[in-house]
Amino acid sequence: MAARKSGSDIHNNGPVSYLDDVPFKLNEKFRCPSKVGLPIGFCLSDCNAILSDLQYDFNLERRTVQWGEELAKARAAEARAAEAIRTDSESERQAASQDAEVGLVGGKKARPSDEQDIVPPALKPVLAGLSHNAILTPLPAPSFGQTRPAPSNPAPQYLNLADFEREEDPFDKLELKTLDDKEELRTILQSQPQSSVSPPQLPPAEHRPVSPSTTPPLQAKTGIFHKPNGLVGLLDLDRGGVLGGQIDADRPCNIRSLTFPKLSDPGDSPLETPLSVYPVAPPRNLSNGTPPSLQRTASNNNTTLPQEQPVFAQNGTPKQSNPVTVTSHPPAGTTLLSLSPSERQCVETIVGMGYSYEGVLKAMQRQGQNVEQVLEYLFTHSRLCDRGFDATAVEECLEMYQGSEEKALEFLQLMSRFGEMGFERDTIKEVLLVHNNDQDKALEDLMTRATAS
């Protein structure tokens, strides 16, 4: 800061300072500090003489290089120590694995558990290795000799949870195990009501005891109907019991025929018997040697069954019909004998699953002898019947729409809906076929026809 003072300024305006030739006035109380002088006798030494006499020895640089060399040596020593530790651990691991192998083979004492290698959890229960899945092994096939009575108190079967940790699927043979278990099948049969198995009306003459002389031929014939999938004939279950005397011994176990009546229709009586339960005749010998399951006559099989087909009145509302006497006609021997061996095997396979001979034969007439197609047709037929539709109408719709469940269900629902409105069944069917199940167009056509008539 340049400060210039002039006498005139001091006299007139007081002390004035200048900054870059710009005057400004300071406060009157401001006083400039006094000058500081050097102490007496103070003098600066000659630096050039001092520097010329100084000799630099490079001690700092030498110390720095020494520190770097020591650090490199320390790092190399640490690397050698780590390599030695890794080598020792690998050698110990190899020795431990060899000791474990020798201990398992030669019977040496095993090492403590903390020194052993960790075994995967799934292999711990089966270290010894099981040869087979013993818990789900199928039972042996029924023998052709004299059957021995089953013990009243069978030995309990214990569940081995280790079998479920193996790689193979424990449920592969579950179906065979279930179907071959005679005790379970006997429990199922004995738990069913007697009215669902035996017909309510049978002539007294048909309840003839089976003589011992006729038993061996029937036992010899069971091999003909032995199924590779493990189905068990009722002959091997309980020959001397009440059910054994009323059920055909050569007929495979029909689980579906032992179910309770359908509960889908609230108007059905609880005493009604499902149509899948066919009246059976006691086992008897035939002169031509044909198994009784292939030759069944309908002369003595008349029984009283309710008619399940709904009958529509003039106003279209369904009414409950009274039970009528119908005659069940199992397929004659000539019908099955006229089939080819492949067709007969297809029939026996599907019948063994619980379906009736009549239903299987009808399905085969429409679908051929492909088991998958026949089963698909039967499944569709069963689902539609479970919805409460008439079996005959279901078969007609499936044949009309080539097995399409969606179109058949739509047709049956519209038939039922228009029938409740009071239209004629034949007219409804004709209109639905013309308009391809179009509800609005079909209803308009029905109203037009009703108005015209």
From Swiss-Prot:
GO (cellular component) term, any one: cytosol
Classification via CDD domains: UBA1_UBAP1, UBA2_UBAP1_like
Record field: compositional bias (Basic and acidic residues): 83-93
Compositionally skewed regions (Low complexity) per UniProt: 189-199
Annotated ranges, domain UBA: 340-381, 403-449
Keywords carried by this UniProt record: Cytoplasm, Endosome, Protein transport, Repeat, Transport
GO annotation (BP), single: protein transport
Region (Disordered): 83-119, 189-223, 260-335
Cell compartment(s), UniProt: Cytoplasm, Cytosol; Endosome
Domain named UMA: residues: 19-65
GO MF terms, alphabetically ordered: ubiquitin binding
Quaternary context: Component of an ESCRT-I complex (endosomal sorting complex required for transport I).
Free-text note on domains in this protein's UniProt record: The UMA domain mediates association with the ESCRT-I complex.
Function according to Swiss-Prot or TrEMBL: Component of the ESCRT-I complex, a regulator of vesicular trafficking process. Binds to ubiquitinated cargo proteins and is required for the sorting of endocytic ubiquitinated cargos into multivesicular bodies (MVBs).
Name this protein carries in UniProt: Ubiquitin-associated protein 1
Gene that this sequence comes from: ubap1
